[in-house]
Amino acid sequence: MVKLPSLKFLRRSTDETPNVSETASHSTVLDVGAEKLGKTYARALLAATQADGSTDAVVSDLNAICDEALLHNPKLQLAFQSPQIDADEKCRVVDRLFGGNSHPTLIKLMKVMAKRGRLGYLVAVRDAAVDLFDEAAGRVVAEVRTAVPMTEQLRGEVTQQLSSRFGKTVRLRESVDTELIGGMVIRVGDTVFDSSVASRLDKLGKSAAAGFARQLIEQSDRFSSSS
């Protein structure tokens, strides 16, 4: 686990402080460009870790940085994203905060990204790295969007049905989208199972938690596929 040191050293005098007005966000810009960029760096990272068998450790460290350090420190994410902070300063930040806790291969990649103005895409790299890691291990990643958080029962049902459908171990990546009119949207690779119409839940009634996922998967021929 990455223990985040104090950020006091980032505090500069008024004249030295960059004029940064953007709002930090844990999620990297969700566009095709960011996704492709994330995959490019993720492939390079995993290739570099295969030789010494450090993939598990590197992915774990990358998850810790994204889910602990960046998520809970908007100021740090702003620093990574801002074009007004030069690459050398970002590299110093990486060294001071993570150099003693994270794998050297990951630190090297982060510095390369900083020098190329790409450090703000670190979360996209993490997402792609985890997906590639799961794929190599024979796991399938299913992105599940629901109008409300899933119950344990529904989570288990979705996992079971998807595992049966694809013949592989499934890991869910869950998100809540309050704009969905009930139901859920499941994406596995290029395949999308969409049942986000409230009337479906009304028909299912109290059996929704136990049977919704099964009906969704079994009737997948009615749902759309997108690339």
Swiss-Prot record:
Which terms does the record give in the GO molecular function aspect?
Answer: proton-transporting ATP synthase activity, rotational mechanism
What Pfam families does the database record attribute to this sequence? OSCP
Q: How does it sit in the membrane?
A: Peripheral membrane protein
Q: Which GO terms describe its cellular component?
A: plasma membrane; proton-transporting ATP synthase complex
| Keywords linked to the UniProt accession | ATP synthesis, Cell inner membrane, Cell membrane, CF(1), Hydrogen ion transport, Ion transport, Membrane, Transport
Keyword Transcription on this protein? no
> Where is the protein situated, by its record's location annotation?
Cell inner membrane
InterPro entries registered for this protein in UniProt: ATP_synth_OSCP/delta_N_sf (IPR026015), ATPase_OSCP/d_CS (IPR020781), ATPase_OSCP/dsu (IPR000711)
What superkingdom heads the lineage?
A: Bacteria
What Gene3D superfamilies does this protein map onto? N-terminal domain of the delta subunit of the F1F0-ATP synthase
Q: Which family does it belong to?
A: Belongs to the ATPase delta chain family.
Subunit info?
Answer: F-type ATPases have 2 components, F(1) - the catalytic core - and F(0) - the membrane proton channel. F(1) has five subunits: alpha(3), beta(3), gamma(1), delta(1), epsilon(1). F(0) has three main subunits: a(1), b(2) and c(10-14). The alpha and beta chains form an alternating ring which encloses part of the gamma chain. F(1) is attached to F(0) by a central stalk formed by the gamma and epsilon chains, while a peripheral stalk is formed by the delta and b chains.
Question: According to its UniProt entry, what is the function of this protein?
Answer: F(1)F(0) ATP synthase produces ATP from ADP in the presence of a proton or sodium gradient. F-type ATPases consist of two structural domains, F(1) containing the extramembraneous catalytic core and F(0) containing the membrane proton channel, linked together by a central stalk and a peripheral stalk. During catalysis, ATP synthesis in the catalytic domain of F(1) is coupled via a rotary mechanism of the central stalk subunits to proton translocation.
| Protein name, per record | ATP synthase subunit delta
This protein's species is Rhodopirellula baltica (strain DSM 10527 / NCIMB 13988 / SH1)
